[in-house]
Amino acid sequence: MTYDRRKFLKTGGLLASSFAISGLACNDDAKTTDGNGTDTAKGDTTAAAVDTRESLTSFGLQLYSLRDDLPKDPKGILKQVSSFGYKQVESYEGDKGIFWGMTHTDFKKYMDELGMTLVSSHCNVEKDFEKKAGQAGEIGMKYLIAPSIGAQKTVDDYKKYADKFNKFGDICKKNGLRFAYHNHGYTFEPLDGQMPQDILMQNTNAETVDFQMDIFWVVTPGADPVAWLKKYPNRFRLCHVKDRMKTAPAKEGDASCDLGTGSIDFPTVLKVAKDNGMEYYIVEQEKYEGSTPIKSVETDAAYMRNLKF
């Protein structure tokens, strides 16, 4: 049976996807590392000599971007991904599981051979979650992520999910990793005078539960990712770097595009993200007008390598 992500989301289910990590560096030759693992410039500090902007030295790919190609040849596609410059991947739970027909240890071994790290995965948290957490912890993954909960009808419904997230967070902690929730647009649309995203963030344990900001899905309903990053410092630890077509109608969800060709100001957003605790920058793309999935993720990698903020 073919895994249908959109159908799964519409039914309000919790499905699966993937992940990535971050490293940041200034762009001059003389650098020193601060306590947060960020490379900073030193030496000649004249404006003409030093470019003080930062760049990402490490970024990842959400494998759902290649959902039509990956199941046919997991190892071959992953090898291509590594050749584009991605250092991390975030998986998702397809018909072959989050390790794509391999055991969790064999998947890690293959990642090591490619010079990549499996940082995280989206998964169906309602099925065999303890087993998944055990396997993820065993191979050093950092996160298991709930990709969706569907739009809820009441504030209390969101509070119930917050309680669930806390339980998932405890299970992850026991296995040496963390739990996160990946947003869609509905948590940034008011419900009974409250914002569902606030409800989830204010009712979860910051010691065990983090959030993955899908920047596209924050912008689509009209919210401001910068404001949310500043409102909840150190809660958004991962993000999906996903651009939005400039010509897309307001609130249109099927509107992602190659990075740098859309309407989202990533230099500004990612700078604020880094300053407020973001660790993992994960590319995701779901639409490929005039291109192919594999070509688009190659183009996206080039954008990420050249991005400065």
Summary of predicted features, one role per range:
Residues T57-Q62, V89-S91, L118-S121, L144-A146, ...:
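Hydrophobic faces of well-ordered beta-strands that scaffold small-molecule active sites
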Residues L61, V81, M111, A136, ...:
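Conserved, mostly hydrophobic/aromatic
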Residues M1, K7-N27:
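N-terminal export signals
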Residues V50-E54, L78-S83, F99-T117, E130-G140, ...:
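Acidic (Asp/Glu)-rich catalytic clusters
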Residues N27-A48:
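Short, low-complexity, disordered segments immediately C-terminal to signal peptides
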